[in-house]
């Protein structure tokens, strides 16, 4: 999985209320995760949102995985 997600994900309070987004877009990590969960393929997402590519989707997954690990550490 993409370990360099930091170069693709930004958090800015002025964009989408501070939700993590793909740099240069208003597309949230949670949007990408929802599309994947609904059954969309990487290719379908990239066709529907040409500003995204496979690296962006992998970065969103890596960000979510990293966030899950942080939550586990804090909860422990």
Q: Which positions does each model-derived feature cover?
A:
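A generic structural signal for short, solvent-exposed coil/turn residues
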Residues: 1-3, 46
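A short, structured beta-strand/loop element
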Residues: 3-40
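Long, charge-rich, low-complexity alpha-helical segments
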Residues: 28-76
